[in-house]
Amino acid sequence: MNKKQRDEISKLLSYVLRHAPESMGLTLDRDGWCEVDELVGKANANGHSFDRQALEEVVETNEKKRFTLSEDGQRIRAAQGHSTEQVQVQHIEKEPPAWLYHGTASRFMASIETQGLIAGSRHHVHLTEDPETALSVGKRYGQPVLLAVDAKGMFEAGVQFFQADNGVWLVEAVPIEWLTKVADTVS
């Protein structure tokens, strides 16, 4: 399977497992899991041609580790990023590192400067330990801006942090007082 095919399957899995399982007639459990065989069967019935082996290759090679297979390999879920109401993944609460980062686009800064970071249609704000990863996320939406989050300060103030299966840090919101603009970059 080539990179283009893997990317197409990955985009489909992200859409279905994060946002619209009903688009293929799937039902996810409360933790976001569905049966691999059912997913592959319904994907093929909806015009997407891939098998279990291709799905497993996508899971294994995905750089951002967007998907998790159950220990027995029979179920799959998106690691984080859900917007569907029926999924309420119980991520493990953890103490974060002192600083985390969020990448956004300059066009969103006016809103961020008044509201802080909010989850929007997702369940959580996504943060990373790696500034470069945050910048690459910001580039997807326009001229990137790198924001630093005083995670230690937030945690000490009683804010809960969670970490998804793929290492992404999750928090309900980041009030403006915990944010610092690190850099504007020209793409």
Swiss-Prot record:
Q: Which domain of life is it from?
A: Bacteria
The cross-references to Gene3D superfamilies, in alphabetical order and at most eight, read: 3.20.170.30, RNA 2'-phosphotransferase, Tpt1/KptA family, N-terminal domain (1.10.10.970)
Tell me the Gene Ontology biological-process terms attached to this UniProt entry: tRNA splicing, via endonucleolytic cleavage and ligation
The EC number(s) this enzyme carries: 2.7.1.-
Transmembrane parts of this sequence: none
Q: Which GO terms describe its molecular function?
A: NAD+ poly-ADP-ribosyltransferase activity; tRNA 2'-phosphotransferase activity
Database matches in SUPFAM superfamilies = ADP-ribosylation (SSF56399)
Going by the UniProt record, its keywords in alphabetical order are:
NAD, Transferase
Pfam families per the UniProt record, alphabetical: PTS_2-RNA
* Described purpose of this protein according to its UniProt entry: Removes the 2'-phosphate from RNA via an intermediate in which the phosphate is ADP-ribosylated by NAD followed by a presumed transesterification to release the RNA and generate ADP-ribose 1''-2''-cyclic phosphate (APPR>P). May function as an ADP-ribosylase.
The family assignment reads: Belongs to the KptA/TPT1 family.
For this protein, the record's HAMAP family field holds: KptA
UniProt name for this protein: Probable RNA 2'-phosphotransferase
- Please name the source species: Pseudomonas syringae pv. tomato (strain ATCC BAA-871 / DC3000)
Q: What is the lineage of its organism?
A: Bacteria, Pseudomonadati, Pseudomonadota, Gammaproteobacteria, Pseudomonadales
